[in-house]
Amino acid sequence: MINQINFLFVTLFGIGKIKKIPGSFASLATTLFLFFLFHILNFSPEIILISVIIIFFISLYAVNIFIKDLDNKDPKEVVIDEFIGQSIPISLYEIAHDGAKETNQVLTSYFIMFILFRIFDIIKPYPVSYYDKNFKNSFGVIMDDVVAGLYVVAVLVLYMVLST
């Protein structure tokens, strides 16, 4: 029972078992889920960000349990890291804008954040690649996506600064 719950958690309710591009599907599901939470249910972005931080710490343990007997320490079916990484820029965007944007602007921004996160997660610029290559454990699995999410934040902040 515990192993089944852990499996559902680290695979984001089975999304990680999708044969092709499970990370992209997990990022897309996360983006849609967060849009629903923020713009349909009007959840507080601060509460969601705190929840993501809690999920980060739970994930360190859960992913470690999942990969402990595997040869591949970063299996494709583990996509909770995509959830965490994709949630960072979206949550910070929502905190910065306090829900003040029109729906079209929000959808465009979410799409851009999704694309940027996937690019940074796939090409792994430094230090994303550092965590991916040097930490063959749950910390490395998760931190490369956290850093990819922070890259998205950096790009968006740079864009906002340069466009004002």
Where are these regions (language model features)?
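Hydrophobic core of alpha-helical transmembrane segments in multi-pass integral membrane proteins
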Residues: 32-36, 49-61, 153-157
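Hydrophobic alpha-helical transmembrane segments
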Residues: 24-29, 46-53, 107, 111-115, ...
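Core hydrophobic alpha-helical membrane-spanning segments
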Residues: 115-116, 155
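N-terminal membrane-targeting hydrophobic helices
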Residues: 13-19, 31-32, 39-40, 87, ...
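Helix-coil boundary and interhelical linker segments in multi-pass alpha-helical membrane proteins
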Residues: 34-49, 90-109, 157-164
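Interhelical loop and helix-boundary elements at the membrane-water interface
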Residues: 1-26, 61-89, 118-150
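Intramembrane alpha-helical segments
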Residues: 26-33, 58, 93, 97, ...
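Final/C-terminal transmembrane alpha-helix of multipass membrane proteins
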Residues: 145-162
